[in-house]
Amino acid sequence: MSIPNNLRYSEEHEWVKTEGNEVVIGITHFAQNELGDIVFVELPEVGATIEADEPFGSVESVKTVSELYAPVSGKVVAVNEELSDQPELVNESPYEGAWMVKVELSDASQVEKLLTAEKYAEMTNQD
């Protein structure tokens, strides 16, 4: 399973890509693999405020419904609308086409506290 080195990771299996004062958030390949076929994604609206370690949406698969936990705090500035019609993108392209939200950071230091690719690989025994 791939774990891109340019991203940071949460213990709840979300990834974070930094773009200036904003971050892009999605779920990892490991998470989508554990969930199985994704059939529905619920995301917050643009303008919503999310808080680190708090739920901000959910992913429903044929196996279960899993909450999405915000790895950082901030204001949602964009939502991947494609996931409404094509939730299977999460399985097909978890790091590219299936990004979930873009967030304007309220505290950029939160990103540095997330796991590196190496630490995430150790946590998920994918090294």
From Swiss-Prot:
The keyword Methyltransferase does not apply. Pfam families: GCV_H. InterPro entries: 2-oxoA_DH_lipoyl-BS (IPR003016), Biotin_lipoyl (IPR000089), GCV_H (IPR002930), GCV_H/Fam206 (IPR033753), GCV_H_sub (IPR017453), Single_hybrid_motif (IPR011053). GO terms for cellular component: cytosol; glycine cleavage complex. The keyword Metal-binding does not apply. The modification N6-lipoyllysine is found at residue 63. One of its GO terms (biological process) is glycine decarboxylation via glycine cleavage system. Residues 22-104 form the Lipoyl-binding domain. Binds 1 lipoyl cofactor covalently. Its cofactor is (R)-lipoate. Keywords: Lipoyl. The glycine cleavage system catalyzes the degradation of glycine. The H protein shuttles the methylamine group of glycine from the P protein to the T protein. Is also involved in protein lipoylation via its role as an octanoyl/lipoyl carrier protein intermediate. The glycine cleavage system is composed of four proteins: P, T, L and H. HAMAP family: GcvH. Belongs to the GcvH family. This is Glycine cleavage system H protein. It comes from Bacillus anthracis. The lineage of its organism: Bacteria, Bacillati, Bacillota, Bacilli, Bacillales. The gene is gcvH.
